[in-house]
Amino acid sequence: ITLTGSSTSGNAINLTGTATLNATNNITLTGSSTSGNAINLKGNNTLTASNITLTGESTSGNAINLTDTTGTTTLNATNNITMQGTRVQIKHSNITAGNFALNATVAGSEISNTTLTATNNINLTAKTNSASSGVYLKDARITSTNGNITANGTATANGKATHLDGNVTLNASNGRIKLTGNGHGSASGILFAGNNRLTASNIALTGNST
């Protein structure tokens, strides 16, 4: 299943009800918007496939937006889930994958009120050029059953590079957790706020602010 959308006046790909996409092989969503969200999943939506790929670009909204306070987005992939965009925002979601990779290139990322479970590796990479955080986690339960959890945040302005903002659980009991944050000015490289728990065979934290 392949969906491609482009918009200059709203959301490019917009699933706002109860949508179910099932594919034996791949689900690929690609969106571009200059005034809204490139990919917008709001409501009770379920995507199931071997591989799920979301790619978005937006100049004034979220490149990838999975959020709804009254609904839940569910993503199930036996192999890989890959998300890439200028900003990636994941809220109120349940995600299961073999491997999970997120790359936000301009305005950071957020994972909150979400359960993310991967059989193997989880890689979160995000850069922010504004006051927002690079990798931002809050009320998130992130588990790698047999692999590693890696978060790499970069803040070029006054945002926080890698920010765990409370009620975050990172569990890689059979692997390692590696958090890296590169901040700028008064911004933190790595910031822990509230109650957070990290569990792994090895944990490495590397923070820098220049």
Stretches with model-predicted labels:
Residues 1-2:
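Long, compositionally biased low-complexity repeat segments characteristic
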